[in-house]
Amino acid sequence: KRAVDLMLTLFPFETAVYEQHGVAVKCVGHPLADSLGFEDHKLRSRQKFELGEDDSIVTLMPGSRGGEIKRLAPVFLDAAVESLIDCPNLKFLIPYSSAANHAQINALLREKSLFRGDQFILVDDSHGAISAADLVVLSSGTATLETLLLRRPMIVGYKLAAITFAIASRLVKIP
């Protein structure tokens, strides 16, 4: 309170917390909240990707940077394969943000022999892929906010680079 002249919040519900503690506060909003709105586009997104209304859809979002994809996509794809054992009709949408990401994900799918009909579908629309999903498995980042705003359940995963893990494991001890 003593160190803050004015707290700027992203969402209207946040202001009450600061007001309770006597902190000057103003909600400035967030561009994603303004652009995505709160309308549910699940059916429209499924139609766009030629998916059925009753299909079970999981969207996999291992990140948008090459290093993230390299670390997380194999883990996410392994989890997808395990999920197919119990739920063989699952379909997986994998959005990509660039031609390089598309090529990288395609190479991983080929490496893991995961070109099975229409089960693993690459799309160039992350908001549509989130909207179409029953569940989103994603890396920590902006996509978590997008998924929250689009009101989809999510599992957030992250895998540190080896050097970061080595440094962090020396600094942080978890009992």
Please name every model-derived segment.
Residues 1-175:
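Nucleotide-activated sugar donor-binding and catalytic core shared by glycosyltransferases
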